[in-house]
């Protein structure tokens, strides 16, 4: 089994660098365009199942890419709960808390790194159970921070390593296993975009 990880398209807050967890923003016009552009690439993968975060931006991306009717909402794909840091930029947070790093410190009133790691592990366990009953590729439409968390936990790294796995909007990653070593998980593709992104590199 492979997992195709798709980050949602651009929103006004992804463009401005504001942390967007539970705030239910829709896509910008550019976000809609880049989500539609996912369709030709994703159609070739013949997904056996499509899971999507409950957030509007992820659901819109999934629908515009052509998979809305076959998708199922999975709350474990939600973005990191930023708690009191919702809507703030990293530079704003560091003025309050110098040296803050979400991957080490988490968010007061929201999720800790241990919380997010446990959620990613829970999702991976369920995906592995699916693998026992079906082959093929599962698509997951999610978010920047949680997508990075899922990738590092997939290959057995500590959650803090997620800070090195930036995901641009409407980008694609493929999580799989080594060809002759099915017990060895791999990252086959990461942060693949149709064209150079208009948004800055995400601040992880």
Map each language-model feature to its residues.
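Active-site metal-binding loops of divalent metal-dependent hydrolases
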Residues: 9, 144, 193
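Acidic, low-complexity terminal tails and accessory targeting/binding regions
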Residues: 81-91, 133-136, 152-204
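Glycine-rich phosphate-binding loop signature in dinucleotide/nucleotide-binding domains
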Residues: 43-46, 127-136
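Phosphate-handling substructures
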Residues: 65-122, 202-204
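Short beta-strand scaffold positions
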Residues: 52-53, 118, 141-142
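Generic beta-sheet signal
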Residues: 3, 133-145
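Conserved histidine-centered catalytic loops in small-molecule metabolism enzymes
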Residues: 45-76, 176-204
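Active-site-proximal alpha-helix that buttresses catalytic centers in soluble enzyme cores
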Residues: 3-69, 96, 111-114
């Amino acid at each position: 089994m492979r997992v195709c990880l798709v980050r949602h398209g651009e929103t006004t807050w992804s463009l401005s660098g504001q942390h967007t967890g539970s705030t239910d923003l829709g896509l910008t016009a550019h976000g809609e365009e880049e989500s539609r552009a996912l369709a030709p690439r994703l159609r070739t993968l013949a997904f056996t199942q499509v899971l999507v975060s409950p957030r509007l931006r992820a659901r819109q991306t999934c629908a515009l890419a052509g998979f809305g009717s076959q998708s199922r909402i999975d709350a474990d794909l939600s973005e990191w709960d930023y708690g009191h840091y919702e809507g703030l930029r990293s530079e704003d947070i560091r003025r309050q808390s110098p040296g803050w790093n979400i991957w080490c410190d988490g968010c007061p009133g929201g999720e800790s790194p241990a919380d997010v790691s446990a959620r990613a592990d829970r999702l991976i366990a369920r995906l592995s159970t699916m693998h026992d009953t079906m082959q093929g590729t599962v698509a997951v439409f999610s978010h920047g921070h949680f997508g990075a968390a899922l990738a590092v936990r997939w290959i057995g790294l500590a959650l803090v390593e997620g800070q090195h796995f930036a995901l641009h909007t409407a980008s694609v990653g493929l999580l799989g296993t080594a060809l002759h070593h099915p017990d060895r998980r791999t990252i086959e593709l990461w942060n693949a975009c149709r064209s150079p992104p208009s948004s800055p590199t995400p601040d992880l």
